[in-house]
Amino acid sequence: MWKLSRSRVLLDEPPEEEDVLRGAPPASAAAPASGASLRGWKEATSLFNKDDEEHLLETSRSPKSKGTNQRLREELKAEKKSGFWDALVLKQNAQPKKPDQIEGWEPPKLTAEDVVADHTEDDRSGCPPWSAWEDDTKGSTKYTSLANSASSSRWSLRSAGKLVSIRRQSKGHLTETCEEGE
């Protein structure tokens, strides 16, 4: 029976009970299985389009030379749009600029009235300006050394006097503003 042509076997199919008894696999059972797998493959491949396939194939191929590798990297960078996190990383890596290096920033311009007003406030407090302290620090850095006992005691007295004058001025400003508000 198997030696006959396949189309004839499918037409002259014996009942299933006889096939089970003979132990021979049914010829029709193989056909739906192969069709099902083909149908499943078509469904799986329909999920992906040709662009995806080409993209996957391009990334899996290894470049033949270093020049093409660099070109691929440049193309990927050009295609990639910068996102929020990329911009954040760039901002983090950028060195902070000094105020004089920032575009459009200019140091404040003091008028003669501002300078006179600063000197009159120092005169009101009764403390002389700290010119001696400034003279000590001109030769070195902007910090003063307190290792010398004479300079440390002088510094502490002057700073205490200056702090008291600042407190008095700030209290005066607070009381004046409170009275104006009432």
UniProtKB/Swiss-Prot annotation:
Highest taxon listed in the record's lineage: Eukaryota
Any Pfam family the entry gives: TDRP
Tissue-specificity statement: Strongly expressed in testis. Also detected at lower levels in epididymis, bone marrow and kidney.
Region feature (Disordered): 1-38, 52-73, 95-151
Stretches with biased composition (Basic and acidic residues): 116-125
GO cellular component: cytoplasm; cytosol; nucleus
Biased composition, class Polar residues, residue ranges: 59-70
Main location per the UniProt record: nucleus
Self-association state and partner proteins as the record states: Interacts with PRM2.
Family: Belongs to the TDRP family.
Biological role: Contributes to normal sperm motility, but not essential for male fertility.
Protein name: Testis development-related protein
Classification of source organism: Eukaryota, Metazoa, Chordata, Craniata, Vertebrata
